[in-house]
């Protein structure tokens, strides 16, 4: 069954380019990063808004939310990870200079995982605040990271045209993508498999338990899919270059939806507890598809 989008609602956050990452919390709130002005915004389910400025130099990028409601986000500009709890208190972890943290997720055990895109490492922050690292192939440029159902985490290796699977007790398992120049970016666990986007070739990829990669070509190979997230009946993804949102079913069926004409450069995407799809558009707004 393909979900049907019957309406869109746009909420303007900034006058200029800004919204980038977005994540829905269990309480219905949305967390949004403003990558250029340097802030994180919480939009509550009742329409309230609270801004947490951290400085334009921080370039907050991707955000995730833990089971306790704490929002974690990467600061690509100043090489930090920050946790923002329900009270508004911030805890910041300083990383190696020039490491370029980008993707972030919460694992099944509550640990926080993040990518260091220019450091070629995956980092892990344990609940006791211990930080450890997993080295990845040199020059691979890890991008997004997602938690699987078996305790593993998966990350896209943008410059290596590959996906890596990590278990805390095992060596990294690198899985090559068949299409050269795929440049994978977004990745998510889709309930039965790992799904990822190939921004340079306009494809969606799937990796099952057998580690086989299946690729699905999108109608426009130049649409530049960027982020992807799981929903009840498949996955939703953004098409950065065409100002659209797409849905792919588990059988590979693709449906695409145009965003409002005033919206451009969709990046982050999330599915809220009520099933609504939310998109962060760098043009200055978040958009709800329902």
Swiss-Prot record:
Q: Name one GO molecular function term.
A: carbon-oxygen lyase activity
Is Transmembrane helix given among the entry's keywords?
no
Q: Provide the transmembrane region boundaries.
A: none
Q: What GO biological process term is on the record, naming one?
A: response to antibiotic
Q: What is this protein called?
A: Virginiamycin B lyase
Active site per UniProt: 267 (proton acceptor)
Q: Which cofactor does it need?
A: Mg(2+)
The residues the record assigns to binding Mg(2+) are: 265, 282
Q: Which HAMAP family match?
A: VirginiamycinB_lyase
Question: How is the quaternary structure described?
Answer: Monomer.
- State its role: Inactivates the type B streptogramin antibiotics by linearizing the lactone ring at the ester linkage, generating a free phenylglycine carboxylate and converting the threonyl moiety into 2-amino-butenoic acid.
Kindly give the InterPro entries that the UniProt entry links to this protein: Streptogrm_lyase (IPR011217), Vgb (IPR051344), WD40/YVTN_repeat-like_dom_sf (IPR015943)
Q: Does the keyword Lipid metabolism apply?
A: no
Cite the Gene3D superfamilies for this sequence: YVTN repeat-like/Quinoprotein amine dehydrogenase
| Family per record | Belongs to the Vgb family.
Q: Which PANTHER family match?
A: VIRGINIAMYCIN B LYASE
């Amino acid at each position: 069954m393909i979900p049907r989008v019957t309406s869109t609602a746009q909420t303007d956050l900034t006058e200029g380019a800004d919204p980038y990452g977005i994540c829905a919390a269990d309480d219905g709130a949305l967390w949004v990063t403003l990558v250029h002005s340097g802030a994180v915004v919480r939009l509550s389910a009742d329409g309230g808004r609270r801004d947490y400025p951290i400085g334009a130099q921080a370039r907050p990028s991707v955000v995730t939310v833990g089971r306790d409601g704490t929002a974690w986000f990467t600061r690509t500009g100043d090489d930090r990870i920050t946790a923002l709890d329900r009270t508004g208190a911030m805890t910041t972890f300083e990383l190696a200079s020039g490491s370029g943290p980008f993707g972030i997720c919460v694992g099944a055990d509550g640990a926080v995982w993040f990518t260091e895109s220019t450091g070629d490492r995956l980092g892990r922050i344990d609940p006791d605040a211990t930080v450890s690292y997993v080295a990845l192939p040199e020059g691979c440029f890890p991008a997004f990271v997602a938690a699987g159902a078996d305790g593993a985490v998966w990350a896209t290796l943008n410059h290596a045209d590959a996906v890596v699977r990590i278990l805390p007790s095992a060596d990294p398992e690198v899985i090559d993508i068949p299409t050269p120049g795929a440049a994978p970016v977004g990745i998510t666990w889709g309930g039965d498999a790992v799904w990822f986007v190939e921004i340079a070739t306009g494809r969606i990829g799937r990796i099952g338990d057998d580690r086989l990669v299946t690729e699905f070509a999108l109608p426009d190979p130049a649409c530049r899919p960027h982020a992807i997230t799981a929903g009840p009946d498949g996955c939703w993804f953004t098409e950065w270059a065409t100002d659209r949102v797409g849905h792919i079913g588990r059988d590979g069926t693709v449906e695409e939806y145009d965003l409002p004409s005033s919206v451009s450069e969709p990046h982050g995407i999330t599915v809220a507890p009520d099933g609504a799809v939310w998109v962060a558009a760098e043009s200055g707004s978040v958009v709800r598809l329902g």
